[in-house]
Amino acid sequence: MGGNYEPDTFKLYFADTGLLVSMLDDESQEDLRANKNLGVYKGALYENMVGEALIKQGYKLFYYKKENSTLEADFFIRSAASLIPVEVKAKSGRAKSMKTLITSDHYPDIRYGIKFSKNNIGHEDRIYTFPYFCTFLLKRFMLGFHAEEEAEYGEGDL
């Protein structure tokens, strides 16, 4: 992924999501603490939280945004055989961009994707869904998943 890396195009994340919350205005902080209302910050908070967990597992953070398009992925990770888009959904989104990336002939290295949301663990249309709190288990899933899939389908069919 480093070969396509553009050092002048990047996203910034806090190493500690608590620091991100501390930068909110006082009213938003109080609303968040008292009412658990994440409001307009929900997407940024969850994306930062997942990014923080990915870094702690040793992943480098890469994202994708196609020019003049809404096609994007919050993060990308790599396994031995595949490039995996990782989406973070603040709401119960359908991960339209991820489905496009998985099914498009333009991206042959993308065979499946991972979505983090408030939903339970699930699998549909080559998208594996996990609750946010399972982010810290991603590396373990990836190691077990790749070995299982390779045994079942063979390296070329992943």
Regions found by a protein language model. Give the residues of each.
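Domain-level recognition of nuclease-like catalytic cores that cleave nucleotide substrates
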Residues: 120-158
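Structural motif
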Residues: 82-84, 112
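Surface-exposed, flexible loop/turn segments at secondary-structure boundaries
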Residues: 20, 69, 83, 93, ...
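Catalytic cores of nucleic-acid endonucleases
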Residues: 90-131
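Short catalytic-loop micro-motif centered on adjacent basic/acidic residues
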Residues: 63, 85-88
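Generic hydrophobic alpha-helical scaffold/packing signal
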Residues: 51, 55, 76, 87-89, ...
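Accessory nucleic acid-recognition modules appended to NTPase machines
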Residues: 1-72, 76-80
